[in-house]
Amino acid sequence: MVAPRALIVLLGLALSGAGAGAAAGAECVALEDFSLGSVGEFPPDWKPRKEEGRSVYSIQEEGGLRFLRAAATRLGVQAGREVAWNLEAYPILAWSWRPIEFPKGSDERKSSTNDSAVSVYAVFPHTPVSVKSVKYIWSRVVPVGTHLTSSAGNTQVRVLRTGPDKVGQWVEEQVNVREDYRKYFGGSDVPRPAGIAVLTDSDDTKSTARGDYAGFRVCKP
């Protein structure tokens, strides 16, 4: 799936008054810790781009940590949560993720193999029927720092990590969403974010992808 997926989770992610939740640290505010909902179920307040996504994503728990597990076989369905925050005060988006199984033969540089074990989107309003987004991926083979585009430029992709060396291990990420938006889309004005989304997909490679996500929060510089 190329064009439909690149259009990224419309999900009703229009700009809203939904704000961030409880503090997750002295300089951070929690967006999602998956503490709501039941283990084994699709998370409340999230929406799949297609209904079949409800079978891909589920809340799990290990050692007291709640997280979102994704397991996709020949599927490419995003899930997202509508949540806005003050980007001027909190430009840093942080989360933890771990790849469990990379899609066989995946390479995000090619439309025929454009699948990822784990990827995270910062979503911004664009038009009444479309969004812009910065997508962060953990690729199987594409070098760290590679910049890719899709959806006629409305999705800008940044490779944060590459390779299987840390398969099964939680890794913490922090990205400056405000700076990345300005870098990739240009201009000094950055719209208020509309939400976050994730995608674990394997439809292009006709294989299986698995990965986990946890602890989404926004932080001061």
Which stretches of residues belong to each language-model region?
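Extracellular/lumenal carbohydrate-interaction signature centered on repeated Trp-anchored short motifs
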Residues: 82-93, 164-167, 189
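Bacterial N-terminal signal peptides
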Residues: 6-18
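A short beta-strand element within beta-rich, extracytoplasmic domains
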Residues: 90-100, 104, 196-200
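Extracellular beta-strand elements of beta-rich domains used
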Residues: 34, 196, 214-218
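Extracellular ligand-binding interfaces
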Residues: 100-169, 209-212
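Extracellular beta-strand ligand-recognition surfaces/modules
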Residues: 115-120, 157, 163, 167-210
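Short carbohydrate-recognition loop motifs
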Residues: 55-78
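Extracellular carbohydrate-recognition regions
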Residues: 24-50
